[in-house]
């Protein structure tokens, strides 16, 4: 991705830049997918752009999900920001909007959507039934951290001179 970014400043380096972005995108780099999709859209390669945004969304890029939501809303061809030559599809708009909200709410946790194809596959695939949940969230919620025993808390607190109930220092030091 970094090399592709550097090549964006080199005259006539566009083809190699897109190839670098595509390679990074296929390895799961969300910003590379977004940039690949954006450059493909400018070149009129709408199918490649659509696939790039899908990759970026799967990798956790919320803005790509938002772009797909807007693109499936059927903007006119003169709308250069969101036009991808797609037919209006209200259900896809809603699903991508839900994905955008999910990724935005969990961005600080590094959320991804590995089950994206089972939620909203690219056309011409028919939309499957969806229960409104995300695999990443289900896995995260099921992996509850182990609560340390009171004995361990006492031991560690004593080693550091902390109150085991509050985590604050036992003695206040004067400056």
Features from the language model and the residues they span:
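Short helix-capping/linker turns of helical repeat alpha-solenoids
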Residues: 1, 7-10, 26-33, 40, ...
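TPR/TPR-like (Sel1-like) alpha-helical repeat modules
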Residues: 50-62, 69-106
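Extracytoplasmic and endomembrane cell-envelope/extracellular-matrix remodeling and assembly machinery
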Residues: 86, 91-141
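Structural signature of tandem alpha-helical TPR/SEL1-like repeats
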Residues: 10-20, 43-52, 88-92
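Long C-terminal extensions of eukaryotic subunits of large macromolecular complexes
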Residues: 121-175
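Acidic helix/loop microenvironments that form the catalytic cleft of cell-wall polysaccharide enzymes
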Residues: 67-73, 117-121
């Amino acid at each position: 991705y970094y090399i592709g970014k550097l090549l964006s400043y080199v005259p006539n380096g566009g083809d190699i830049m897109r190839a670098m972005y595509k390679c990074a995108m296929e390895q799961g780099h969300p910003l590379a997918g977004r940039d690949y999709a954006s450059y493909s859209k400018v070149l009129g390669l709408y199918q490649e752009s659509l696939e790039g945004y899908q990759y970026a969304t799967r990798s956790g890029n919320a803005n790509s999900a938002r772009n797909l939501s807007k693109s499936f809303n059927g903007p006119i061809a003169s709308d250069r920001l969101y036009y991808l030559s797609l037919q209006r599809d209200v259900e896809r708009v809603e699903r991508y909007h839900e994905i955008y909200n999910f990724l935005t709410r969990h961005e600080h946790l590094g959320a991804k959507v590995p089950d994206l194809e089972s939620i909203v596959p690219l056309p011409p695939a028919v939309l499957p039934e969806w229960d409104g949940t995300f695999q990443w969230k289900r896995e995260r919620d099921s992996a509850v951290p182990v609560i340390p025993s009171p004995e361990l808390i006492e031991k560690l607190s004593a080693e550091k001179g902390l109150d085991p109930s509050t985590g604050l220092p036992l003695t206040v030091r004067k400056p």
